[in-house]
Amino acid sequence: MAGNSRFISSAQSGPHDDLAALVHRHLDHPFRKPILDYNRQAFSAALAARDAWNPGAPLVLDAGCGVGWSTLRLAERYPDHFVIGVDQSSDRISRGKPLSLPANAHFQRADLVAFWRLFDEAGVRLARHYVLYPNPWPKIG
């Protein structure tokens, strides 16, 4: 199958020379970026959608779901789980899909870093976590 994606290339030939020091620095200092209210509201809305469907349902997170095809497929694959598709782009999430949204699926616009932190803060454990479309140049913020 041919695609039109650009080839990913980098001048970096191996791990960064200071990788260990950078990791230790981040481990030694807490992440201080505040979680914005809209992310807290998005997190609450996602859990409320799960609770409305089945309060005890295991959770599947489709991180960076884009237009949501993977969220729909995951909901089909795990009919007894509640699948939350999260993406930062409301444009991508809102793009039309020929399939209807299953009852065990929910799309949410939110910042993924905040969403992950909110799962941890709330003590919520995921049954499955998918990152199917990784950005080769992730950015926080």
Language-model regions, residue ranges each:
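Conserved beta-strand/loop positions that form the S-adenosyl-L-methionine
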Residues: 63, 86
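A short SAM/SAH-binding and catalytic strip from SAM-dependent methyltransferases
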Residues: 127-141
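Class I SAM-dependent methyltransferase "Motif I" SAM/SAH-binding loop
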Residues: 64-68
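Conserved SAM-binding loop
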Residues: 96
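S-adenosyl-L-methionine
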Residues: 1-59, 70-72, 76, 99-122
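Short beta-strand element of Class I
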Residues: 81-84
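Conserved SAM/SAH-binding beta-strand->alpha-helix loop
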Residues: 89
